[in-house]
Structures are given as structure tokens and as C-alpha cells.
């Protein structure tokens, strides 16, 4: 399939919420090299092009190895601020109106970077973005699931002095061998603290991990969740309970979860009534921010304008926003899709 020009223009322009993006995964090779020079960090790649060429991932772990190496250049509040502002500018260009951004403090505290440096650098950039770009956002602190639950507890406690700067906790990193129940107690503690709960599940792990994230961790949203398609009863449950899945199609193909975007179950799950939302995950590494993910997905799958309206609506409905602000965003989406589509810009004739 090839998306028609009018629909392509609409999906580029529609208001969107981004609910699945790792701020460290927005670190472009050019910025990695700039920060490495600023901080005198030696990189194992001689050039930007050599680093980009290394982005030939075979699975989640091969990606994570490079992801953590890239993050090694982040040392100061200024570094985290600059990375975050770079993401915001790209998101605004893609008509992202609200973002709920993951950050991985353990990736940085393990290198001796204080957690306050991480949180303040990111949050200060988002505060400036709210004023400068009218960009709404919040932060979600993610635990690295390949580390222990004790380490997660220590991270949560260390973050509590900054409690007003993040709204929830999540769970990411290597899914294989690290089931949701490994983090049951720390999620229970986060729930007691009034934090929102999300978890990566059913990306490389089985459909059962999705159910366990809901039942054991009490996750309010599932990040990825595509393996739920293997369990018809689970798909029915997700639809019935309006559990949102934050799906990242380009990531799923890049990490070999699916061999081709045409094999992706997004459309089947959307048609089954699941609250699917569409996001970029780690866009610097997977070759696409929000609009690139939307366009590639609409190119590959039999999706139409009604699906695009639904995906945009789902993204705001699933967001952790105050009711009034959520209603305003939903009205903005509905108004956009009720208007007749504008013609795409004319292409100048060849000379």
C-alpha cells in the first residue's frame, strides 16, 4: 500500500500525544559527538557516520548495548537539558502537543551522575518548552528490569525529593528473563505514593507478560504489548477494559520483533477495539520520530482517515492529564478531523 498525499498531509498535521519515547533514545549521533567533545569522553567510534552505521540491530539487547554507550556522554544538567530541547523541537515540528517522556536514572547514577542532575536537566528543559512552544509534558521514571528490585527501590527513594517533577514510574530494558513479577513490591510502593504505573510488556516477552503487568504490577498502560495478539482472550480483555497500548512500529521492525511493517498487528488490534496509540520509542536509533512512524505505518497497513482520527484521540485519552486539559486536546483533535482535508502543497514542475 501507499498512503495518498492528502491523508499523508493530515497525519503529519494532526495534533498528537507521544506516550512512549525514551529521552535517552532521542540522542542523535551528532549530539553524542558534541557532548563527548564537551565532556572529553572517548567514544569507540571514529565519526558520526561510523556510529550511525553501528545501528544495525539484531534484537533488543544489541540495541541496548549501543544505547547505554551513547548515554555515557550525558554528565551535566546542561547535557540533559540540551538533549531534551532537541527532542522537543522535533516533536513540535511533528505536531506533538503533549508528551509523557521516559527517563532511565539508573543508566546515569551507575556512572556517578547524581539523580538530581538527571531530573533537573530534563525537567528544566520541559518547563522552558512549555513557555516557549506551548508544549505540554510530564516525566515517567523507568526502572531497568535487568537490574534488581532492590536497585529499583533505591532509585525510587533517591528520586522522592524530586517527586513534583515526575508523574509515574515505568519498567524498561531487557524483557527476556525479567518478568513483571520481579518488580511487584516496588510498583506497589509507587502506587502507595500516588504515582501512575506503566510497564513495557509483550515486546520480546510473551502475551502472559502483558496480563502479569496488569494483574501483578497494576499497570495503567502497557508499553508495546504487541504480543497480546497471540492471546485472543487477552485482546478481548484489553478492548473491554480500555487498556491503552503504546505501540512503536518502526522500533518493532528495527529490533526484529516483526520482519516487516506489513506483518505488524496494529491494525488487527485497533479493529478489535484495543486502545492502540502510535509512538517513536527511541527515534534517534530507529530512524523515525512521530510523523515518520505514522507515515510508515499508514504506508504499510490498510489504515484510513478514521483510523488516524482514532489513533490521535486514543493518544490523548490514554494520557495522564487533568480532565479539563484532556478535554481541550480531544476537542482540538475532533475539530481537526471534522474539517475538510487541505490539499498538500503543490510540487513545483521540473525545470
Swiss-Prot record:
Binds 1 zinc ion per subunit. The record marks 224 as: Important for catalytic activity. Its cofactor is Zn(2+). The keyword Kinase does not apply. One of its GO terms (molecular function) is adenine deaminase activity. One of its GO terms (cellular component) is cytosol. It holds the Pfam family A_deaminase. This is Adenine deaminase. It comes from Cupriavidus taiwanensis (strain DSM 17343 / BCRC 17206 / CCUG 44338 / CIP 107171 / LMG 19424 / R1). The lineage of its organism: Bacteria, Pseudomonadati, Pseudomonadota, Betaproteobacteria, Burkholderiales.
Amino acid at each position: 500500500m501507499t498512503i495518498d498525499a492528502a491523508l499523508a498531509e493530515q497525519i503529519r498535521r494532526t495534533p498528537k500525544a507521544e506516550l512512549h519515547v525514551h529521552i535517552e533514545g532521542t540522542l542523535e549521533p551528532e549530539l553524542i559527538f558534541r557532548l563527548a567533545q564537551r565532556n572529553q569522553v572517548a567514544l569507540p567510534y571514529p565519526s558520526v557516520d561510523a556510529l550511525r552505521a553501528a545501528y544495525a540491530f539484531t534484537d533488543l539487547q544489541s540495541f541496548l548495548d549501543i544505547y547505554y554507550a551513547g548515554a555515557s556522554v550525558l554528565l551535566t544538567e546542561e547535557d540533559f537539558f540540551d538533549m531534551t530541547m532537541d527532542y522537543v523541537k522535533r516533536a513540535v515540528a511533528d505536531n506533538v502537543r503533549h508528551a509523557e517522556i521516559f527517563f532511565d536514572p539508573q543508566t546515569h547514577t551507575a556512572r556517578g551522575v547524581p539523580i538530581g542532575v538527571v531530573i533537573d536537566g530534563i525537567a528544566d528543559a520541559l518547563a522552558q518548552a512549555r513557555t516557549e512552544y506551548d508544549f505540554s509534558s510530564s516525566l515517567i521514571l523507568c526502572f531497568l528490569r535487568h537490574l534488581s528490585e532492590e536497585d529499583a527501590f533505591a532509585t525510587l527513594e533517591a528520586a522522592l525529593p524530586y517527586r513534583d517533577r515526575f508523574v509515574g514510574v515505568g519498567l524498561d530494558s531487557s524483557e527476556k528473563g525479567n518478568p513483571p513479577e520481579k518488580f511487584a513490591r516496588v510498583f506497589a510502593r509507587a502506587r502507595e505514593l500516588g504515582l501512575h504505573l506503566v510497564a513495557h510488556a509483550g515486546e520480546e516477552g510473551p502475551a502472559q507478560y502483558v496480563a502479569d503487568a496488569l494483574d501483578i504490577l497494576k499497570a495503567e498502560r502497557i508499553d508495546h504489548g504487541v504480543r497480546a495478539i497471540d492471546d485472543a482472550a487477552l485482546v478481548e480483555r484489553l478492548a473491554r477494559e480500555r487498556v491503552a497500548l503504546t505501540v512503536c512500529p518502526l522500533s518493532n521492525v528495527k529490533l526484529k520483533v516483526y520482519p516487516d511493517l506489513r506483518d505488524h498487528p496494529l491494525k488487527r488490534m485497533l479493529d478489535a477495539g484495543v486502545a492502540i496509540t502510535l509512538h517513536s520509542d527511541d527515534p534517534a536509533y530507529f530512524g523515525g520520530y512521530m510523523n515518520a512512524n505514522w507515515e510508515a505505518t499508514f504506508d504499510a497497513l490498510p489504515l484510513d482517515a478514521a483510523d488516524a482520527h482514532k489513533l490521535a484521540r486514543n493518544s490523548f485519552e490514554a494520557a495522564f492529564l487533568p480532565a479539563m486539559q484532556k478535554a481541550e486536546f480531544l476537542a482540538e483533535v475532533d475539530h481537526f478531523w471534522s474539517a475538510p482535508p487541505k490539499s498538500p502543497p503543490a510540487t513545483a514542475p521540473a525545470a
